[in-house]
From Swiss-Prot:
EC identifiers of the protein: 6.3.3.3
Family matches, as HAMAP family: BioD
Assembly behavior: Homodimer.
Active site: 38
Compartment annotation: Cytoplasm
Keywords per UniProt: ATP-binding, Biotin biosynthesis, Cytoplasm, Ligase, Magnesium, Metal-binding, Nucleotide-binding
Disulfide bonds: none
Task performed by this protein: Catalyzes a mechanistically unusual reaction, the ATP-dependent insertion of CO2 between the N7 and N8 nitrogen atoms of 7,8-diaminopelargonic acid (DAPA, also called 7,8-diammoniononanoate) to form a ureido ring.
GO BP annotations listed: biotin biosynthetic process
Protein name from the UniProt record: ATP-dependent dethiobiotin synthetase BioD
Record GO terms (molecular function): ATP binding; dethiobiotin synthase activity; magnesium ion binding
Cited PANTHER family: ATP-DEPENDENT DETHIOBIOTIN SYNTHETASE BIOD 2, DETHIOBIOTIN SYNTHETASE
Length: 215
């Protein structure tokens, strides 16, 4: 594993932040040089909350790259999708600033995990979806799903979008923290999605996030 990877989810609040932090921690334990980035954070000021969670999970203090703003290049105060948060803050989202920050991190670290906002179809601007940006940059995707009711549908829609856009799926992360309270639904979702991943993206990895990984 080397390079820049985009961490997305099948929905908002699906566990991307914890998954990103846990994956970064595992890579650190393997001796890898890794950093996480939250290119667009909404609902915050000055510091990206998700980056703080990443560092806590990784067992690391805020890094020099964090202090330089490279890991959180765009922060908006209103908790909404980036296109709306930018409009309400009265300024445009600077895609060049984000691209440059990611490139600088990639030059310093072996692996950069870029956590997106929401799912693949979340608008970054009025004219650009998150999935458009991922395709433009050529990033492989790490997709976070769960065992809660509706996850099969949302995951298959995400699979279809990735195929349509010609984007490589690196791995599917099944988040047990957000499992359905119904054990039958949770287990069936896991079994079904594991089979579909093998059928639809045979080279992609299957990963699981345990309940004990909850922050």
């Amino acid at each position: 594993m080397k390079g820049v990877y985009f961490v997305s989810g099948i929905d908002t609040d699906i566990g991307k932040t914890v998954a990103t932090g846990v994956l970064a921690k595992q890579l650190l334990q393997q001796g890898k040089s890794v950093i996480t980035q939250k290119p667009v954070q909404t609902g915050c000021q000055n510091i990206a909350d998700d980056i703080a969670v990443h560092r806590k999970i990784m067992g690391k203090p805020m890094q020099e790259a964090d202090k330089q703003g490279l890991t959180m290049p765009e922060i908006f105060s209103y908790p909404a999708s980036p296109h709306l948060a930018a409009r309400l803050d009265g300024r445009a989202l600077d895609l060049d600033k984000i691209r440059t920050a990611t490139q600088q991190l990639a030059a310093q670290y072996e692996i950069v995990l870029v956590e997106g906002a929401g799912g693949l179809m979340v608008p970054l601007t009025e004219n650009l979806l998150t999935i458009d940006y991922i395709r433009q940059q050529g990033y492989p995707v790490i997709l976070v799903t769960s065992g809660r009711l509706g996850s099969i549908n949302h995951t298959l829609l995400s699979f279809a979008a990735l195929k349509q856009y010609g984007i490589r799926l690196h791995s599917l992360v099944f988040n047990h923290i957000h499992d359905s309270r119904d054990a039958h639904i949770a287990q069936d979702s896991l079994n079904y999605l594991k089979c579909r991943l093998k059928a639809d993206f045979s080279e992609a990895e299957w990963m699981e996030l345990a309940k004990t990984d909850a922050v």
